[in-house]
């Protein structure tokens, strides 16, 4: 975490949750970075790949992935994509009560 940039988006806003809407071109790849708030990444359009030290997650359209506060990560995609993020204060009362790891699922 300390070796990568700190993205401080929304930290100056005195609210428990801050929202960000983003549009990215095909081939986008962020630098590795981290946030003081937890980040819920929602793929509105396109497919997003989120990579951390713990692994990589493919987030298809209309799905989301949770990135806990202060976890170094990178966001990228081969195609253009639209993304919404909720940045949630790193406070025990705002953390998910429980969650499960991603698993393969057939429909």
Segment roles from a protein language model:
Residues 100-107:
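Conserved small/polar residues in nucleotide/adenosyl-binding loops
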Residues 29-30, 49, 65, 69-74, ...:
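Histidine-centered metal-chelating micro-motifs
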Residues 54-66:
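Short acidic-glycine-tyrosine-enriched beta hairpin
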Residues 44, 60, 79:
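A cytosolic small-molecule/anion-sensing beta-strand core signal
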Residues 1-47:
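Generic protein-terminus/edge-of-domain signal
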Residues 36, 52-54, 79-81:
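A generic beta-sheet turn/junction motif
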Residues 71-93:
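Ligand-binding loop in jelly-roll beta-barrel domains
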Residues 29-32, 81, 98-99:
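Jelly-roll (double-stranded beta-helix
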């Amino acid at each position: 975490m300390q070796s990568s940039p700190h993205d401080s988006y929304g930290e100056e806003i005195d609210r428990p949750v801050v929202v960000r809407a983003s549009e990215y071109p095909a081939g986008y790849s962020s630098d590795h970075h981290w946030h003081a708030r937890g980040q819920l990444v929602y793929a509105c359009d396109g497919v997003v790949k989120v990579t951390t030290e713990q692994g990589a997650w493919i987030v298809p359209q209309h799905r989301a992935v949770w990135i806990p506060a202060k976890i170094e990560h990178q966001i990228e995609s081969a195609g253009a994509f639209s993304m919404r993020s909720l940045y949630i204060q790193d406070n025990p009362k705002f953390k998910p009560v429980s969650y499960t790891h991603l698993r393969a699922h057939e429909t």
